[in-house]
Amino acid sequence: MPIEVVITNDFEHLSKVAAEIVKKKLVELLKRKKEVVLGLATGNSPTGMYKHLARAANNGEFDSSRIRSFNLDEYIGLPGENAQQRALHPESYCYFMIQEFFGLLKKKFIETNVPFGSLIDQKVLIKELKRYPHDWACKGTGAGKSIVIKQKTGSEYLSWIRKEILNGYMQKIKKAGG
């Protein structure tokens, strides 16, 4: 599939054009499938597009109740005594997506999924990363930097994160057809 370059005037125009592209694809897929898996980026760039998509769904241009979404990101280390408090913290991507997209829909998605970052206790994670420096590697540069936990670890906590949180989320996406 060739790449198409689209030049827009400003953020609002970009948001409308992007929403039209996504809406067109959703309508096409919903004609053929019972439900659609939609991957969602998090951050300020897609917020205008999300508002246009919510408006289109609310106007009946596509059936949002047949969509299952998966977000790409979630923070770890947000304040809160438990996972629920961290997930609903105003700086969490879960909260952000409710404010910017999910909460705007009259007909809710079948299911919305944000990675389980709120389950990770940052203090324990930092302690385990220091204690087991050979169990993980740092990949990428700048804002794109991430930690990769190796397959075999001496740390039960790092092993749990890899198996239950990271791999568990990927398996859920695959099971949904994404």
Give residue spans per PLM region.
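Glycine-rich beta-strand-to-loop/alpha-helix junction loops that act as flexible
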Residues: 40-45
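Distinct, well-ordered alpha-helical segments
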Residues: 53-54
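A short glycine/serine-rich beta->alpha loop
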Residues: 7-8, 39, 82-87
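Alpha-helix N-cap/helix-start and coil->helix boundary motif
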Residues: 12, 46-47
